[in-house]
From Swiss-Prot:
PSII is composed of 1 copy each of membrane proteins PsbA, PsbB, PsbC, PsbD, PsbE, PsbF, PsbH, PsbI, PsbJ, PsbK, PsbL, PsbM, PsbT, PsbX, PsbY, PsbZ, Psb30/Ycf12, at least 3 peripheral proteins of the oxygen-evolving complex and a large number of cofactors. It forms dimeric complexes. The lineage of its organism: Eukaryota, Viridiplantae, Streptophyta, Embryophyta, Tracheophyta. It is a multi-pass membrane protein. This is Photosystem II CP47 reaction center protein. SUPFAM superfamilies: Photosystem II antenna protein-like. Belongs to the PsbB/PsbC family. PsbB subfamily. It comes from Triticum aestivum (Wheat). It holds the Pfam family PSII. The chain crosses the membrane at residues 21-36, 101-115, 140-156, 203-218, 237-252, 457-472. Keywords: Chlorophyll, Chloroplast, Chromophore, Membrane, Photosynthesis, Photosystem II, Plastid, Thylakoid, Transmembrane, Transmembrane helix. It is found in: Plastid, Chloroplast thylakoid membrane. Binds multiple chlorophylls. PSII binds additional chlorophylls, carotenoids and specific lipids.
Amino acid sequence: MGLPWYRVHTVVLNDPGRLLAVHIMHTALVSGWAGSMALYELAVFDPSDPVLDPMWRQGMFVIPFMTRLGITDSWGGWSISGGTVTNPGIWSYEGVAGTHIVFSGLCFLAAIWHWVYWDLEIFSDERTGKPSLDLPKIFGIHLFLAGVACFGFGAFHVTGLYGPGIWVSDPYGLTGKVQAVNPAWGAEGFDPFVPGGIASHHIAAGTLGILAGLFHLSVRPPQRLYKGLRMGNIETVLSSSIAAVFFAAFVVAGTMWYGSATTPIELFGPTRYQWDQGYFQQEIYRRVSNGLAENLSLSEAWSKIPEKLAFYDYIGNNPAKGGLFRAGSMDNGDGIAVGWLGHPVFRDKEGRELFVRRMPTFFETFPVVLVDEEGIVRADVPFRRAESKYSVEQVGVTVEFYGGELNGVSYSDPATVKKYARRSQLGEIFELDRATLKSDGVFRSSPRGWFTFGHATFALLFFFGHIWHGARTLFRDVFAGIDPDLDAQVEFGTFQKVGDPTTRKQAA
């Protein structure tokens, strides 16, 4: 037939049986990939340190999605929260991976069956005997079924009525666990960080989908609308389906990058805006201030800061620090975090506490500047030592650590003080193991960054696909120069069935 690569899908244009077959095969590929990817990730995943080496530092992509839906245990005997389990049952990580692979195999067989037995009675128009699909009716059926699934997820799975619930955490990603969620029916349900909105929105959207599906099953479209929107043309379905997919892709790119209850930081890592706004730094200082108000010493107050919270306040966990072509996990970049060294407090010889100005997200290098509590520059690491007035040596800066591994240790020699000042630009200071994975020291993005980039990119491409196929179906008669209602369609790409020798042709 000699079709160019970009037109090969026209072979299923007027062939409902094989159109169904290729879609079932596509589902087989997607499900098979998901199951296989899950098994691969489980093979390389190290669950031993959920605090300093969580799934998102290891570059896991599908494990976080399973976890947010309620899967926490492995047949390997470990739990995502760090404990051990004895009988995880079928709904473990491996169980879910296996069910996807089994489902993929069944879809593969179903696709072959439908490819071989393509000429089914159900696809024929009773009056004409030609292949035909009642697209408005099919739309109603799919809308109804999608509504049932949506309602069921919100009313049963999320609420724990029949299911595990979903991953819920505190605003600082410290206490996350899978739990049942009650629907939020008030204004708070529209807050993207309130988990109850997930339940209520699925229940509401599912109800709407069920009602809309029943409407489209019981009410036929007016003839003018049917013809105007080309409801009899399968390319109309393609165009509107692409629209639904690219819209969803744009939405999830936003909820992933900006953060929401659906993308917990314990599973996908923090967002770049939490670094930009000093989100974790403010919480750490608030906790230290509260500790001091309770008559704790500075050392005791800092020692009470959870290592998990301190680790979030480190620029290496900012998903915007990765480069576009830097493949690999965060652990392959700056290394595997081993321990928190503690919080360094810098002071000049007058005893003023100095604060290192932190590196903004999009800088690779940044001057080391130390300011006092009023924001006045008191010390720096100069570029030109001959002209310096505020060098660490001249100002007499010292550093003392509170909390962490170096708790109570102080340094006054300039070389060491400058080393820790430079590291303080990057947030809290951690010991990182770069030898195990041969990490190169160059920051990588988290799965949050990869997911956002992929979905935003494909959403843009699919947007153009929607425009392209929408224009083709709306203006088919103009483009082809024929009346779409003619019985004999002989223009290329508009045969009743591609390659069908029975299509009437004009005499040469």
